[in-house]
Amino acid sequence: MNRYDDASDLRRYEANQLFHEAYEAQQANDYERAIELYKRSIETYPTAEAHTFLGWVYSFQDRYDEAIEECLEAIRVDETLGNPYNDIGSYLLAKGDSYGSVRWFKRALLAPRYESYAFPHFNLGKVYENRRKFLDAARHYGLALKQKPNFREAAVGLRRMQSRLN
């Protein structure tokens, strides 16, 4: 390993430490500290996760445009991570743009690296339910449950759609 690799590994390690500190601050609802630490993590070694989580904190403060910008930056860093696509869709929903959100939820479902595809399915279920496309909503709530069997909100949504369709 050459010196550059050593320095890169050290920066990556430091960024990871800052990321974990930021997440702890976020969990403690210390959003300003979390923002500061996520930004320092990104400055040290940019990752899609740090950009996505910084956006998440912005969303807690209703700073949706900044949250979307961070998610777009996350996608530029690593387009394989599914979280920023789903998050952009969620932020657009929060801004009242349900039509714009659909393509982002669908892109999340195509991302190769995502812990739980249940969330974009659930979000699509909500969008389709609001548009009164109950069959599509039921399908996505069901797919969310298939991905995450204990997903209570998806189960409730699916039951609600089943009662509407009967």
Task: Give each language-model segment a name.
Residues L10, E43-T44, V77, A111-R113, ...:
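Structural marker of alpha-solenoid helical repeat scaffolds
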Residues R11-E49, F53, F60:
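Alpha-helical segment of the N-proximal tetratricopeptide repeat
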Residues E14, T47-A48, L81, E115-Y117, ...:
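Residue-level recognition of tetratricopeptide repeat
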Residues A28-L37, Q61-E73, K95-L110, F119, ...:
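Structural signature of tandem alpha-helical TPR/SEL1-like repeats
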Residues A50-H51, P84, A118-P120, A154:
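TPR alpha-solenoid repeat register
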